[in-house]
Amino acid sequence: MKNPLFPVFPGLSRSLITAHFPLIPMSPDQQLAHLTAGTAKVLSEKELLEKLRLGRPLRIKLGVDPTAPDIHFGHTVALEKLRQFQELGHQAVLLIGDFTATIGDPSGRSATRPPLTRDEVLVNAATYTDQAFKILDKAKTEIVYNGDWFRKMNYEEILKLNSRVTLQQMLQREDFRARLDAGQEIRLHELQYPIMQGWDSVEIRADVELGGTDQLFNILVGRDLQKEEGQPQQVVMVMPLLEGLDGV
């Protein structure tokens, strides 16, 4: 099978994908400078520095929904950042959204995503992990599937989770507001997505969550849910969005 990170994107040099910083001892302040380089937003650098000073490996979450056969070009930026955390001794947690992929992330969408079957998602998930390990150190990566907890929830538990978030909060999302203003429908299951992504952070006790700038709202929901659960809130680290060669 072709390496999807190189032939599919011929303009991307192999050195950009495979060149990583050497694993060398760094002080918390040095780690902060190294890890925040190239990010679009970090909320907050002060909190990240405090976590780095704890002297333990941090749990760094990156979630991907296997909605297509290949990892999106834009994921490589977050994967590279996750690799940087690995090289400093932190725990990379690659969360495969095998459950949320059947819903579809509404972030940045002007219309509802078409639903995927579970079989389609599982086939895609297998290729996603293979491709991710072209960047990540497989031996130092923890892989989790959010279907492991969401499929165990009963309706009472789902209602309890939903009660922690208001409709007003959900409608603060720019993409939802834009669709309302344009008279386009928003399906109720789409409103669930940020809550579910946020709950993922509670389940894996994330110290930091990585994502694109389009994920900012969802990651902030995770902070709120962690606070309600009495957990330390995750640091938000979002990366600039890169378009693929097809412009998406």
Give the ranges of each region predicted by the language model.
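A general structural detector for well-ordered alpha-helical segments in enzyme core domains, enriched
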Residues: 78-81, 124, 128
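Non-catalytic terminal extensions that flank enzyme cores
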Residues: 4-13, 17-66
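A glycine- and small-aliphatic-rich helix-loop capping segment at beta-alpha/alpha-beta transitions
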Residues: 78, 112-113, 161
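A charged helix-plus-loop insertion that forms the helical arch/lid used to bind
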Residues: 106-122
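Alpha-helical recognition segments enriched in aromatics with Gly/Pro capping
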Residues: 93-100, 125-140, 145-248
